[in-house]
Amino acid sequence: MTLFILTETSAGYALLKAKDKKLLKRDDLATEASTAEGVSNLLKLKSFQKFDSATAALEEVASVVEGKVTPRLASLLDEIKDEKKVSLAVADPKLGNAIGKLPGLDISLIADSTTADIYRAIREHLPTLIPGLLPQDMSTMSLGLSHSLARHKLKFSPDKIDTMIVQAIGLLDDLDKELNNYAMRVKEWYGWHFPELAKILNDNIAYSRLVLKMGMRSNFENADLAEILPEEIEAAVKAAADRSMGTEISEDDLENIQALAEQVVGFSEYRSQLAGYITARMNAIAPNLTALVGDLVGARLIAHAGSLTNLSKSPASTLQILGAEKALFRALKTKHDTPKYGLIYHASLIGQATGKNKGKMARVLAAKASLGLRVDALAEWDDDVTEEDKAALGTEARFNLERKLAALEGKPLKPRGVAIGPDGASAQPGKFNINEARKYNPDADAVDQDKATPSKKMLVQEVQDEEMADADSDEEPAANGVDSDSSDEETSKKSKKSKGSEIEKLAEKAGLSVKRYKRKLERGEIQFDAAGNPSAISKKDIKKAKKEAKKEAKKASKGDDKEKKRKRSDETEDTDGKKKKKKRDD
């Protein structure tokens, strides 16, 4: 049986024919094939199919690795169809199974460990078996093909490098901390010279720019600050500079302060540039996630998970509480309620929701974000696909979530395409404004005075039913035309006033307000002496009285129990006596 050996190389497919039919069964195969002359004596080239380009080589080798037979390989195997009693040695068993399924190819396949020695010898001495193939060219082609194959396996793309996002968002957080520290140091340092400026101007960047431009506070009076400050704040700054209480500083001190202020301005400019870079990278790597939660929140989620692939493998429940691991494990340990959200809490959709709906929105948003993440991580797009098409899933999901949030909050539904701000209202990007710092208003101070609280009208009043007088009655109206009922009302009002004045006097004697006196009087906590002067019973006395009442109640209950026991014992004695009499009579 003729033996053929199929060899896949970086240059093409080679079909080798063994000169010895029992080559694989020889015991001295390894020693004889250790040299180039020995290999050339054992094998000869039957046919060679060369790859046309590097792209074709990548496609062919990738198909062979997956165990598929390409048209080029099938045409090479057609050359041994006509031969009878043919055996073919293949290095990959998966590829051997695929070749065995080809129609019209009646050959016996060998894809076991017996071919290991011969394939090792072929790889070592391949240039001697294929004429015109130099060792230098072979190594170059093998290196290029291995890189292309590895890139193909990893589906490598420069736009899919999520490491850049992880590093960038970490740098952004570090910049925020350093920028805040530097800005506070500038305010404290320059505050010795112009302390009023920090109270008027809140913005750190504008403060640093002002220090860089003006220097000494004496330069503020005739300077034009319209490029940095609005008119109102500019006037306030100039007025404060004229009557400032700060100390004088030297030019050397001012140079160092301005050097630090320059660092603050430079850091702020680089931070805005870095934020734009993160936005662009997030739109390229995870457009659906960016459409749902925003670029900064999405970047922090990717950085926390380690990579976009790891984040896409996480379920929605994990995505919802990502970043709150300490709180989660603490809640599980103490058997308390688990947290509802982690890093996703900072998304604008959750920020628009009120307290009762934040948990619902976090759960729904995490579910939609997990779907969008899988599309971002695993979808393969063509070159002609636009960015809008890539982010279509996230945009549609965000629109539906905004409508659901509006329905939960009871707000009117916004039409498609309307930007919704954190307060839930349609918003447009506004201009940057520097607001003046809030000041204490001394004119609003006032001395509290005792004001008589107006008596509240009773919502329900009692009305007494009175009998109507007959028409033929002899009663005549009063001379002034006023009925006798009016006089009764006047007398009742006078009596009420007199009662109210008496209660006020008694409350003053007891040292209580009228309200407290009435409450204590209703509870029975007011006692009167022999002269009729009231006094409030202290809480200690009330507690003692309650304890004594409880003790008396317990004693009474114990006495009742004793009487009941005595009655029972008397009854039992009577019944026993009756039984004894009956026995005597009998």
UniProtKB/Swiss-Prot annotation:
**Keywords of this entry:** Nucleus, Ribonucleoprotein, Ribosome biogenesis, rRNA processing
The Nop domain is annotated at 285-410
Q: What is its main location?
A: nucleus
Q: Where is the composition biased (Acidic residues)?
A: 464-477
Pfam family, any one: Nop
Localization recorded for this chain is: Nucleus, Nucleolus
One GO-annotated biological process of the protein: box C/D sno(s)RNA 3'-end processing
Q: Show the segment(s) annotated as Disordered.
A: 464-586
Could you confirm whether the keyword rRNA processing appears in this record? yes
The keyword Mitochondrion belongs to this UniProt entry's keyword annotation: no
Q: Which InterPro entries match?
A: Nop56/Nop58 (IPR045056), NOP58/56_N (IPR012974), Nop_C (IPR042239), Nop_dom (IPR002687), Nop_dom_sf (IPR036070), NOSIC (IPR012976)
One annotated Gene Ontology cellular component of this protein: small-subunit processome
SUPFAM superfamilies assigned: Nop domain (SSF89124)
Q: What does this gene product do?
A: Required for pre-18S rRNA processing. May bind microtubules.
Q: What is this protein called?
A: Nucleolar protein 58
Organism phylogeny? Eukaryota, Fungi, Dikarya, Ascomycota, Pezizomycotina
Gene encoding this polypeptide? nop58
